[in-house]
């Protein structure tokens, strides 16, 4: 009922969660379209595991989690890009290798230092409630930066997504833009991990884009539709998790899954 929802919104942690969540969902959806089209959508998974490792080490050393995780994951994103572009190891294998190593390191560090406490499980499975005020402010600033970068550089991102060879021939610095997309994705993944958890963050990147592609024809329409889907599913997921006391991240993914099903049916007609 409305009164319950209004009651829910009176909590500061809920307000924080919704503001940060909507912004991060937008970032993930916009980047997701580009990543899915470039067949690079697994990078979200790889980076989230690296993020988990970084957060584990940060909490073991008593450092600020975001301050450690953001640079580490950005570095990993750039490395993964380099690996997948010019090496014998194919992109997906490189991602699998790096992500499983990072996850293993994270789990070992945690078990040696703190044990699997609540903070850790919130990184694995996500907890909207664990956002501190400082984290929320930082998350808002970073996600707005990601959105601005995407919007301002949209024509170039569009070009690099669709025809890298042609873009390179016409003098676009495709490597720079690929790196930019990777860096923006890295930031989004770290921000999203707090809400979605490391295990589910890639769905925030992939699902809205795939759903939008079922019904929309142009890149622009897909981007806008994907953004809308992402935000709506995020809000529905948070409401569901609040009322039924289910884990937030998983609830958001289920909302996305249902949406994907509906759009697939619509797209068939």
Regions found by a protein language model. Name each.
Residues 148-181:
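Membrane-helix/interface signature in polytopic inner-membrane proteins
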Residues 33-116, 212-224, 241-244, 267:
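Short loop segments and helix-boundary regions at transmembrane helix junctions
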Residues 4-9, 124, 128, 229-266:
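C-terminal binding/interaction regions
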Residues 155-156, 265-269:
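Membrane-interface capping segments at transmembrane-helix boundaries
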Residues 5-16, 95-155:
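Transmembrane helix-bundle core of multi-pass membrane transporters
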Residues 17-20, 65-73, 92-96, 140, ...:
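Loop-to-transmembrane alpha-helix initiation sites
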Residues 50-60, 98-110, 130, 174-186, ...:
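Small-residue-rich segments of transmembrane alpha-helices in multi-pass membrane proteins
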Residues 194-195, 199-250:
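Transmembrane alpha-helical segments in multi-pass inner-membrane proteins
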């Amino acid at each position: 009922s409305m009164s319950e929802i209004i009651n829910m919104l009176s909590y500061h942690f809920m307000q924080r969660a919704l503001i940060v969540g909507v912004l991060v969902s937008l970032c993930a959806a916009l980047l997701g379209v580009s990543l899915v089209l470039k067949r690079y959508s697994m990078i979200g998974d790889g980076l989230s595991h690296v993020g988990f490792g970084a957060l584990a080490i940060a909490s073991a050393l008593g450092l600020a989690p975001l301050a450690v995780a953001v640079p580490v994951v950005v570095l990993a994103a750039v490395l993964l890009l380099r690996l997948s572009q010019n090496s014998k190891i194919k992109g997906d294998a490189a991602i699998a290798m790096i992500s499983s190593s990072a996850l293993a390191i994270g789990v070992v560090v945690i078990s040696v230092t703190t044990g699997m406490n609540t903070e850790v499980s919130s990184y694995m499975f996500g907890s909207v409630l664990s956002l501190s005020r400082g984290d929320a402010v930082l998350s808002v600033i970073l996600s707005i930066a990601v959105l601005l970068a995407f919007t301002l550089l949209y024509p170039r991102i569009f070009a690099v997504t669709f025809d890298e060879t042609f873009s390179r021939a016409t003098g676009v610095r495709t490597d720079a833009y690929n790196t930019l997309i990777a860096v923006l994705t890295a930031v989004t993944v770290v921000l999203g991990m707090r809400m979605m958890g490391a295990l589910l963050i890639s769905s925030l990147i992939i699902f809205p884009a795939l759903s939008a592609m079922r019904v929309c024809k142009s890149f622009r329409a897909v981007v806008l539709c994907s953004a809308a889907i992402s935000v709506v599913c995020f809000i529905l997921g948070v409401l569901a998790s609040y009322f039924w006391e289910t884990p937030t991240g998983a609830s958001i993914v289920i909302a996305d899954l249902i949406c994907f099903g509906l759009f697939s049916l619509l797209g068939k007609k």
